[in-house]
């Protein structure tokens, strides 16, 4: 009996552009309140939005830096990428505050692949935003 290894398992239907935009807009609405003071949007177009901290005198890993990325969202081909830079700090207290449902969506070091959005997941994103903001503030980056 031969087994055909070329047959691929059923794949999840690809999200439409409108579905991706809906997810993008909901996450952006949670990010926007943080755009104040030293935190500014460097890119703010339909499909990409990012927030950077421009605090004068920041020193990161022993080097002076004019800015550091806080969070970015980008519509990709099959998901909305939520790039959450505070997770790079390797701060155990920050990781402990991350909602488990959101952590399941982490792909790579700092990118969460958002393919659905409901009130619970949106609240998880809000929780992550607050925890990341607090961590950056504690490090003197905001």
List each language-model region with its residue ranges.
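Charge-dense, helix-prone N-terminal extensions
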Residues: 1-142
